[in-house]
Amino acid sequence: MKNISENQVKASEEKKHTPEQAADERPFTAAVITLSDKGAKGQRVDESGPAAVQMLEEAGYEVREAFILPDEPELLEKELIRLADELKVDLVLTSGGTGFSLRDRTPEATMAIADRNAPGIAEYIRMCSARITDRAMLSRGVSVIRKGTLIINLPGSPKAVRESLGFILHGLDHGLRILRGSASECAAK
């Protein structure tokens, strides 16, 4: 066993931060999109989006935008591209549009703009949700990557949004750092 001297400890504490460390230390940025025809028309109060924003902010994320869109795939595709390519947020959460209704097209719009699939996140949400309700198997939500942005579809109800984020939020940091280019060791903890 090697003994570390007090001087070595002080020297290591005085090391300058590398750009990689600086990227790790700045807060993750996020955007939240609620998909709801009634919400977009002002006929229903959105509780899901604010629930997601609150949880993200409590976890230290900087939420850049939160808004409601009607269940129109083309509008969602346009906004996902803008948030990933122009605003360059680390994380986009969508809420709603993941069920079996004919208007539920969030997964299709999300896949249409994806560079890569990240299925484990959506699978994990369904697995954990299945412990609460057997209806979890009816969720069609997906998780994908576009450039440096992770995009995750969440269910539409405020309760399901809180539960889903509760399952995954603690585990996203490492993946988001990798997307930023500031984490290289998948096995490192």
Residue ranges and their predicted role:
Residues M1-K189:
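Non-catalytic beta/alpha edge segments that cap or flank active sites
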